[in-house]
Swiss-Prot record:
Pathway: Cofactor metabolism; coenzyme M-coenzyme B heterodisulfide reduction; coenzyme B and coenzyme M from coenzyme M-coenzyme B heterodisulfide: step 1/1. Its EC number is 1.8.98.-. One of its GO terms (biological process) is methanogenesis. Keywords: Methanogenesis, Oxidoreductase. This is CoB--CoM heterodisulfide reductase subunit B. GO terms for molecular function: CoB--CoM heterodisulfide reductase activity. Belongs to the HdrB family. InterPro entries: CoB/CoM_hetero-S_Rdtase_bsu, Cys_rich_dom, HdrB/HdrD_reductase. The heterodisulfide reductase is composed of three subunits; HdrA, HdrB and HdrC. NCBIfam families: CoB_CoM_SS_B. It is an enzyme of class 1 (oxidoreductase). It holds the Pfam family CCG. It comes from Methanopyrus kandleri (strain AV19 / DSM 6324 / JCM 9639 / NBRC 100938).
Length: 305
């Protein structure tokens, strides 16, 4: 019988990148997990924005989402750094602060809900690394991510901020200054993870920067793309739809703000999409054609187009 997890979709994935959702569902089914929909779930809400304006409102909304998973009786899986950061930190605060928990439950009682602190929030990166394991992922690979010349696909991984820090809350396995989990997960698919300058730098999108100061946010993105290409990457992969949007849409937006641009576009994949390809799934199943940056160059290198 498949193990069950509550699947927290967030906002960006279902609205902008449904292929990430499809890939995640397919990959987890292949790994022996059933992802259960959280009917009625709202925005996480975004920690850097909502939390900075009104901590109690932010944590109350997050607690409502947590209570939906508690009602179903399964831990939560997120595929977005922001959603993970919000739900996981709210869970931590409510378990550590009785006064805050009492306040939140008074509010939730008005809609016949209660936060009980009985579920754990997992990020897809950490769940795959610790709960599933690199060994099992390797065993599921039917089509290693190798180019037609026999060389492994070169992938530049992007971790993102809320996955790593604050480390005392995220529970990230290993060093947050020199993380390796996503690198190992990528290499389990038969690809090569390439090191590059400023690897753990922000993509530029978070904290409201993208919506408020787009050019500032794109400075980060442009620098990261330059660094990834310099390292010889064929593509970049991430574990967050917001980071994904910043790299995917951001490469299109750069031309409106900068004269000096990266020498070429770098295709962008969520990790579950790369895993789907390695597990033998068709590119069409993973909705790669919905990305802003054409993924065809990578598919051609893999002999899939």
């Amino acid at each position: 019988m498949a193990k069950k997890l509550c699947f927290f979709l967030g906002c960006i994935m279902p609205n902008r990148y449904p292929g990430i959702e499809k890939a995640t569902r397919l990959v987890f089914e292949e790994l022996g997990y059933e992802l259960v929909d959280m009917d009625g779930a709202s925005c996480c809400p975004a920690p850097g924005v909502f939390g900075s304006f009104d901590l109690k409102t932010w944590v109350t909304i997050a607690a409502r989402n947590l209570s939906i998973a508690e009602e179903k009786g399964y831990d939560i899986l997120t595929v977005c750094n922001g959603c993970f950061g919000s739900l996981n930190e709210a869970n931590h605060l409510l378990q550590e602060n009785p006064e805050l928990r009492e306040f939140v439950n008074e509010k939730l009682a008005e809609i016949d809900r209660e936060y009980k602190g009985k579920v754990k929030v997992y990020h897809v990166n950490t769940f795959l690394y610790e709960e599933v394991g690199v060994k099992k992922i390797k065993e599921k690979v039917e089509r290693p991510l190798e180019k037609t010349d026999g060389e492994p696909l070169k992938v530049a991984v992007h971790y993102g901020c809320h996955l790593l820090k604050p480390s005392e809350v995220t529970g990230f396995p290993g060093s947050v200054e020199d993380p390796r989990t996503l690198d190992e997960l990528v290499e389990a698919l038969g690809a090569e993870s390439v090191d590059y300058k400023d690897k753990i730098m922000c993509c530029g999108a978070g904290g409201g920067v993208r919506s408020r100061e787009l050019k500032v946010s794109l400075h980060f993105t442009r620098e990261k793309i330059f660094n990834m290409l310099e390292a010889g990457a064929d593509c970049t992969t991430n574990v967050c739809p917001f980071c994904h949007l910043q790299f995917d849409r951001g490469q299109i937006e750069m031309k409106e703000h900068f004269e000096k641009l990266p020498p070429k576009k770098l295709p962008v994949f969520h990790y579950c999409q790369l895993a789907g390809l390695a597990f033998g799934m068709d590119p069409e199943e993973l909705a790669l054609e919905t990305h802003e940056i054409d993924c065809t160059p990578v598919l051609e290198k893999l002999g899939l187009a």
